[in-house]
Design a protein with these regions (language model features):
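Active-site-proximal or metal-binding-adjacent scaffold patches in catalytic folds
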Residues: 1-76, 85-122
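Walker B catalytic acidic pair
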Residues: 81
């Protein structure tokens, strides 16, 4: 087999899987947050140094490589970005909000950080 074709096919599979998994996790997590009246849109973007971001207009951007991480790490990133829909910065108020949504977020962030090099480079 052509190695480039295999790589392209694998990346396409990961993107499709990411779209499915992130939509399912977002649909489960978002309704728990009283400041959200609807599910926010999200798109996928490969990023070298970020797992996600939130635009000022409220669009979530998620790294498709995140789908390779454990579910608790995916939930952490999604919750992190959903909290930005209420607090657009990393202020103490933001972290209080994140603590209220996911009290053990720091443990999941540490796990994700420990896996980042492997997940982002495969």
């Amino acid at each position: 087999r052509d190695p480039l074709l295999v790589r392209f096919s694998l990346e396409a599979w990961y993107r499709q899987r990411a779209r499915e998994v992130f939509a399912r996790r977002l649909a489960e997590l978002a309704p728990r947050l009283p400041w959200l009246s609807a599910l926010p849109d999200f798109r996928l973007l490969n990023m070298r140094t970020q797992w996600g971001s939130c635009s000022p207009s409220g669009e979530l951007v998620l790294n498709p490589q995140l789908v390779k991480a454990p579910r608790v790490c995916i939930d952490y990133v999604i919750n992190h970005e959903l909290c930005h829909l209420r607090e657009q910065n990393h202020s103490p108020a933001y972290y209080r909000l994140l603590d209220s949504v996911m009290p053990d977020w720091a443990k999941h962030k540490a796990l994700l950080d420990s896996l980042a090099e492997v997940l982002l480079n495969r």
